[in-house]
UniProtKB/Swiss-Prot annotation:
A GO MF label: ATP binding
Organism lineage: Bacteria, Bacillati, Bacillota, Bacilli, Bacillales
Binding site for ATP: 34-41
Name the UniProt record assigns to this protein: Adenylyl-sulfate kinase
Enzyme class: transferase
Protein origin, superkingdom: Bacteria
Protein task: Catalyzes the synthesis of activated sulfate.
Species per Swiss-Prot/TrEMBL record: Staphylococcus saprophyticus subsp. saprophyticus (strain ATCC 15305 / DSM 20229 / NCIMB 8711 / NCTC 7292 / S-41)
Length: 204
């Protein structure tokens, strides 16, 4: 891919801090990671709704949705998976700069790729949430029928079946989606945001 050296970064007249003060909350990336069927999308949708009801400015990026547009030229090879997460990381960084709480739901199977996104952001701007769930339970849910297709050889490189998933080394939050309800999971995340002062920024 060709790149250009003749580009300049243009600073905005409105800073990230000013946007956070206007919104009265800090901006951050809430990054859900876990196997297909572990509950990432379900919990992220419920979290977005709960935060919206509290007048929090959010946007949710979903793994399937971005492949309809931004990443529709990517497949599921290790190289394409890496590029998929790199692009989402850059988009998430822009949204954090815009003052939003950005909720992402991606399998994001590789620790190194998740760490690269974390390193794009400032300190405390990345909250990794691991939706912990056994492969057996994920496969029994199989909301899209993908596990069965992978078992039948119709899908190659499917995470958990014939491609690896690396559990997070030290996530900020672990949700046991085999035990915890959606409501419990959402409350756990919101409690974390409150305790760590993400939801209380006073306007100047």
């Amino acid at each position: 891919m060709a790149t250009s050296n003749h580009i300049t970064w243009h600073e905005s007249a409105v800073t990230k801090v000013e946007r956070q003060q206007r919104n009265q909350h800090r901006s951050v990336v809430i990054w859900f990671t876990g196997l297909s069927g572990s509950g990432k999308s379900t919990i992220s949708v419920a979290l977005e709704k709960a935060l919206y009801q509290q007048q929090v400015h959010t946007y949710r990026l979903d793994g399937d949705n971005v492949r309809h547009g931004l990443n529709n030229n990517l497949g599921f090879s290790p190289e394409d998976r890496k590029e998929n997460i790199r692009r989402i990381g850059e988009v998430s960084k822009l949204m954090v700069d815009a003052g939003l709480i950005t909720i992402t739901a991606f399998i994001s199977p590789y620790q190194a790729d998740r760490d690269e996104v974390r390193n794009l952001l400032d300190d405390k701007e990345f909250i990794e949430i691991y939706t912990s769930c056994s492969i057996e339970t994920c496969e029994s849910r199989d909301p899209k029928g993908l596990y069965q297709k992978a078992r039948n050889g119709e899908i190659k490189g499917f995470t958990g079946i014939n491609a690896p998933y690396e559990e997070p080394n030290n996530p900020e939050i672990i949700i046991d989606t085999e035990q915890d309800s959606i409501e419990t999971a959402v409350n756990q995340i919101i409690d974390y945001l409150k305790v760590h002062d993400y939801l209380d920024v006073k306007p100047v």
